[in-house]
Amino acid sequence: MNAVLITGGTSGLGYEAARRVASGRNRVVVITGRDLDRVERTAERMRAETGGDVRGRALDLGSLAEVRRFAAAHRDEGLPLDAVACNAGVQVVRGLTYTRDGYETTFAVNHLAHFALVDLLLPMMAGGGRIVFVSSGTHDPAQHTGVPAPRYTSAAELARPPEDHSPKEGRRRYATSKLCNVLTAYELARRHPELRVNAFDPGLMPGTGLARDYPPLMRWAWRRVLPVLTLVPALGVRTPQRSGAALAELLVSPRFADTTGRYFTGLRPTRSSEQSYDRKIARELWEGSAELTAPQTG
């Protein structure tokens, strides 16, 4: 059997998507997480729930060396990939932090690590293979999400931004990383027409880990208030179960076998932000990201 790889598969959206795919019992499901014990326990629980072949693998997206190690191990395993979901993400709003590679954490984990991972795994993709980049409505100022509008400058500057430790800029860096996800999805679709590459907005989901860096009151609202709002579909608040089912559909359903270069809100194809269609920016991001993720020599 071929495999479906889902980064960040131990909880929330990634867990629910992996569980849905595993329930089909016709593909190996590989989930990743930073903590090996946790991801292996999650895989064991998912195998018991679904009867599917679920495998847990450690992957620290905060280290490009770890991304390369993971990709090499997967290639050595010889397991062809039907689909990859670039799902794992962080949102650092308190202060300015950096990865082991010296890159700003939100940009490095949400964009650069997945850019490198996909590039390294391309030789393992089956014909017509699918790649889904999990983005967010925060990338689009026209959606008025309350998050500061993304500010794309260059890949190099996003990796090493000016020193601004304010929560506002932390949220802006998150929105910008989600814009980069959409730009990358579109550029990858253009460069590899043999693949099916799309971006996905799961909606605002309570119960996920993205609010872990927020102040206590906001974390409380995330856990207690937002779940109630899922009862009002017009507000765009969705449960991880609902969005996970949609992501699983994009990854494996025959319905989307020929769909590429699109942006989905749930299962509905929609327009992304105006800036996300700027091919000049997409090329600069691609080329800059390739430089930033190349192995360092000397």
What positions do the PLM features span?
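C-terminal/domain-terminus segments
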Residues: R191, A199-D201, M205, L210-A211, ...
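C-terminal helical subdomain
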Residues: S177, L226-P269, R279
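C-terminal helix-and-tail extensions that cap enzymatic domains
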Residues: V4, R19, R255-G298
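Alpha-helical packing segments of well-folded alpha/beta enzyme cores
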Residues: T42, C180, T184, S243-A246, ...
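Active-site-adjacent bridging/hinge elements
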Residues: A85-V90, A221-W222, R262-T265
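Rossmann-fold NAD(P)H-dependent dehydrogenase/reductase core
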Residues: M1-G209, P295-Q296
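Alpha-helical membrane-targeting segments
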Residues: P162-R171, L204-R242
